[in-house]
């Protein structure tokens, strides 16, 4: 399902079947996070059918070590700069795989809108 998004205008590929679309650009000369970086981000997560399962909007941004997130986030966020806002399409095997999570059936393609606010 994530590969179907690749046909849409403005959608670009990343490794391992992940795709993204730039919604807003930060400063291109900013540093990129590494897996050991602590990233601060606002996000909204949806399944491929559009059902929202999580969001930090209207609350406190997520602040976490990047390597503690799902592989799809790790791959995508290492390409982002502070101020970037992307819609990221993550195939199940780069998300939660065959395992269900609250509000997410096993085997689900995930769509995250991620805005990178900071890197430490």
Where are these regions (language model features)?
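Cross-family detector of peptidyl-prolyl cis-trans isomerase
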Residues: 1-120
